[in-house]
Regions:
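Short glycine/proline-rich turn/loop motifs
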Residues: 21-22, 50-60
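Active-site nucleotide-donor binding segment shared across nucleotidyl transfer reactions
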Residues: 77-110, 119-120, 274, 301-302
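Conserved SAM-binding loop
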Residues: 122-124
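C-terminal "lid/loop" region of Rossmann-like NAD(P)-dependent oxidoreductases
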Residues: 1-14, 19-20
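A short secondary-structure junction signal
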Residues: 188-194
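Amphipathic terminal alpha-helices
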Residues: 34-49
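Short aromatic/basic micro-patch
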Residues: 16-17, 31, 113, 290
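Conserved catalytic core of two-metal-ion nucleotidyltransferases
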Residues: 57-83, 126-186, 203-302, 309-334
Length: 334
């Protein structure tokens, strides 16, 4: 309820209920629904660190971050074309390509994916092909980094997340991710075992890295508690070796399924390898980029009804960025 709003000759009475219809009556056009506005208000009061996206964020820098990422996506595309390496837009970047023909308006990174054999070939040439201002961040190039996938970081920028902000000796520049989809078993039981060992090895590495506890929920709480107690006895090099072995366990086997062993969708399990065997090109921010020909099946597997827009109250960046500095890229143009 409101005390009083004056608008021209009309005055809203004290105590009158403020509604979307009343706002429109006085000539104002709401940018979001009243319901979304209330949800955002409640979430803001409960979680003041969350950023909700309408047009821009990061102090007006999100659009510029996306433009910078686009420039280096074009570099990846150039390298992959030169060496005939097959790759696809991935995750939210793929969803943005299909639904928005560009970045999702509230997305703050870019992702590409490859099959393992293409990923390994890409890693052999990427450092010599990329401009000098790009750092290839893998455990082999930076001692403090323990991600199972590759991050390409832009030098002389800052884009530190709530997690990586605790490791300021690491490169924390603007980043985009390069991930491999590895093979998994043909049978449900082998897929489940593969998934379990991958999750355990990744949990050990991540929680040793962040000095945090392994969550004991889920389907295997006893195993999680045991592993949490012994993880301190496992040297990090051995934990990373075990993680790599888990990811590539089926690499030289003839299987028909893949899984997202490196990424966020590990728990979704296996999907048919055939979905990533053919490529088509779609518009993305005015350029053509490759996506899986079976993108509909792949995106449905990831997101369900992926063309359905999420509520405004849920539109927020996927990373909790705590430090942002575009450096010399503040005026970047492709």
């Amino acid at each position: 309820r409101i005390n009083q709003i004056e608008h021209g000759a009309e005055t809203v009475s004290a105590g009158e209920m403020l509604t979307t219809q009343l706002i429109e009556h006085y000539g104002y056009e709401p940018q979001i629904s009243m319901e979304d506005g209330l949800i955002i208000l409640v979430k803001y009061l409960q979680h003041t660190d969350e950023v909700f996206i309408f047009d821009n964020t990061y102090l007006g820098k999100l659009k510029k971050v996306q433009e910078i990422l686009l420039g280096y996506l074009l570099e990846i595309d150039r390298i992959c074309r030169k060496y005939d390496i097959r790759y696809f837009l991935a995750g939210g970047t793929l969803l943005g390509a299909i639904r928005h023909h560009g970045f999702i308006p509230w997305d703050d990174d870019a992702d590409v994916m490859m099959l393992r054999e293409d990923y390994d070939r890409f890693m052999q040439v990427v450092q010599e092909e990329l401009p000098e201002n790009i750092f290839v961040q893998v455990p082999e190039t930076e001692k403090g980094n323990h991600n199972p996938f590759t991050k390409l970081r832009i030098n002389d920028t800052m884009f530190a997340t709530e997690f990586t902000g605790h490791f300021m000796d690491m490169h924390n520049g603007i980043f985009f991710d390069v991930l491999a989809h590895d093979q998994t078993g043909n049978h449900r039981w082998s897929q489940k075992l593969h998934l379990m060992f991958t999750m355990l090895s990744r949990s050990i590495v991540f929680n040793k890295w962040g000095n945090t506890d392994i969550k004991s929920g889920g389907n295997h709480p006893v195993i999680c508690r045991i592993v949490d107690h012994v993880k301190y006895l496992i040297p990090m090099p051995f934990a990373e070796w075990a993680q790599k072995k888990a990811l590539t366990f089926f690499q030289n086997r003839n299987t028909d399924y893949l899984y997202d062993g490196m990424g966020r969708n590990l728990k979704r399990g296996a999907f048919p390898k055939s979905w990533l065997m053919e490529t088509v090109y779609v518009d993305f921010e005015g350029y053509k980029f490759p996506v899986p020909k079976e993108y509909d099946q792949y995106l449905t597997w990831l997101y369900g009804d992926y063309m359905q827009m999420i509520p405004v109250s849920a539109r927020r960046t996927s990373h909790s960025i705590v430090l942002t500095d575009l450096g010399a890229y503040g005026n970047y143009k492709i």
